[in-house]
Amino acid sequence: AYKDDGAIRFKVPSDRTIEFKDFVRGDMSFETSDVEDFVILRSDNTPTYHLASTVDDIDYGITIIARGEDILSSTPKHILIMEALDAAIPNFCHLPLLFGPDGKKLSKRHGDTSVEAFRQKGILNDAMFNYLCLLGWSPGDDIELFDSDFAISKFDLNKVLPNSATFDEKKLLWLNGQYIRSTSPNKFEEDSLQNIENQLSRELFHEEKDRLLKIFPSVQERIETMNDLFGQVQFLIDEPFIVDKEDWESVTVSYTHLTLPTK
């Protein structure tokens, strides 16, 4: 390493071939002649990603580094740092990136990309987990619906596809609908009543619950998200009778001044 304008650069040897096996992409090799000397410590003494992430992996004893394929070109640098620190070289796995419908890397410009945002849109946790598993991997035998236990038992990094996957929200909605339909009637009723009460910000009346329970079986077969529920059943819910304060006062004043008839 050497100092350059206040920063510290790692001196890359010019006559080496860095080789490693990638679980997704197979045998990889990079010529160090194609890798420039890189900064590991900025002029303000803060470490760069290359140094910080590598030291962190060493410190935690990471044996498999799984990350996006956009970091693949940085792997030779990280291996050189590990060798310089006399650390064991872990296994690597560079996963395909997710793309939007326009063929560009998935980002906020495509709309919602956080799990919490999809949860608020009515996507079930199990459905989201299931769908994300299918982006670049498959358990085989054309199986699309499975729980986390099944996925864990079947998952193998060697079977992850190297090709980038497209995040298809329509497919996610379809999958979410399948999970809703596979929910037990009792669980669906419980979740639905809670969902409606959250929308109303009040508890349902017994009469309303009775009406809703009768229609839930047919609604369960139609909706794709729990957010679709309220629009399907709103006509069965009693609207609260709201009286303007001034009107209420005028009515109460009138009744308090009524004279009871006498014999």
What are these regions (language model features)?
Residues 77, 127, 256:
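Charged catalytic carboxylate motif
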Residues 256-262:
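Conserved small/polar residues in nucleotide/adenosyl-binding loops
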Residues 86-91, 95-242:
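Catalytic adenosine-cofactor/nucleotide-binding cores of aminoacyl-tRNA synthetases and other
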Residues 243-248:
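Conserved alpha/beta core segments of nucleic-acid transaction machinery
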Residues 165, 254-255:
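Generic alpha-helical segment signature
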Residues 1-106, 114, 139:
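Active-site cores that bind ATP or allylic diphosphates and position pyrophosphate for catalysis
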Residues 218, 251-254:
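Post-transcriptional modification and biogenesis factors for structured RNAs
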